[in-house]
Design a protein with these regions (language model features):
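C-terminal accessory module of base-excision DNA glycosylases/AP lyases that mediates lesion recognition
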Residues: 1-25, 122-124, 137-211
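Structural motif
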Residues: 24-36, 46-47, 86-91, 181-189
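Extended cationic-aromatic binding surfaces that line active-site or macromolecule-binding grooves
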Residues: 30-62
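Short, hydrophobic/amphipathic alpha-helical patches that form generic packing surfaces
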Residues: 36-45, 98, 189-200
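Short helix-capping/linker segments at secondary-structure and domain boundaries
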Residues: 44-54, 102-109, 149-151, 199-206
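Short, well-structured alpha-helical segments
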Residues: 52-56, 73, 90-100, 112, ...
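Alpha-helical ds-nucleic-acid-binding substructure associated with the helix-hairpin-helix region
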Residues: 61-131
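A structural motif
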Residues: 131-137
């Protein structure tokens, strides 16, 4: 199987984004970008991805920074609990409220204004994202991996986990060379799929198994 064929197979079988798993389609709109940010915050902690995704679905009841700020702390805790995100529910509920305050005060609740302030500089986007409470390095990578679908200046975004997945699949461990294997429109799904190869035991073998 050629590298391009391998890449296509990986996307086809494992290229579901976290956003899609959480039940929303990412677009360059304030609500969807905010939901991606919340999802990235939830994935920043040492917790199973499926639990974070489940909690993000429940928090979809508060799809904007304003709605999140208007929700009571207990409403946030309850939503996290329904998603089984119970280990960090209280601290995360507080962080989400503080994060909503930050986004509303600094960007009017619109992450596109953060993008504009960064002026197309990926490093600056990541610096500004670091200001969001509880959004750690892992969460920032997740946000950028997925947001590259709608923010072209992030492309190609293949972080260390994605590159590790590429190496496991026998593909180049280089972002530029990986980008040559698929269309730019597929970078986000390709990156998500490569990360999944590092997390799900036996997935690569299933993908490479003869039909």
């Amino acid at each position: 199987m050629s590298e391009q064929a391998t890449a296509r197979a990986i996307i086809r079988e494992a290229g579901t984004s976290y956003a899609a798993q959480a039940g929303f389609t990412l677009t360059d709109k304030p609500s969807q970008l905010y939901r991606l940010l919340v999802l990235s915050v939830l994935l920043s902690t040492r917790i199973k991805a499926e639990i974070a995704v489940s909690a993000a679905r429940e928090l979809g009841a508060f799809p904007t920074a304003r709605r999140m700020r208007e929700a009571t702390w207990q409403q946030r805790v309850d939503a996290l609990g329904r998603g089984s995100y119970v280990r960090y529910d209280e601290s995360t509920a507080t962080a989400l409220g503080n994060g909503a305050d930050l986004l509303l005060d600094k960007y009017g609740g619109d992450l596109r204004k953060l993008r504009k302030e960064a002026g197309g500089d990926v490093r600056r986007i990541k610096e500004l994202l670091r200001e969001v409470p509880n959004l750690g390095p892992v969460g920032i990578d997740i946000f950028c991996r997925e947001a590259q679908a709608v923010w072209p200046e992030l492309r190609p975004y293949f972080d260390k986990k994605a590159l590790s997945g590429a190496e496991k699949a026998g593909l180049p461990k280089d972002a530029g060379r990986l980008a040559e294997l698929v269309d730019a429109a597929d970078y986000a799904r390709f990156s998500a799929a490569l990360v999944r190869l590092t997390l799900e035991k036996g997935l690569l073998e299933e993908i490479k198994a003869p039909a």
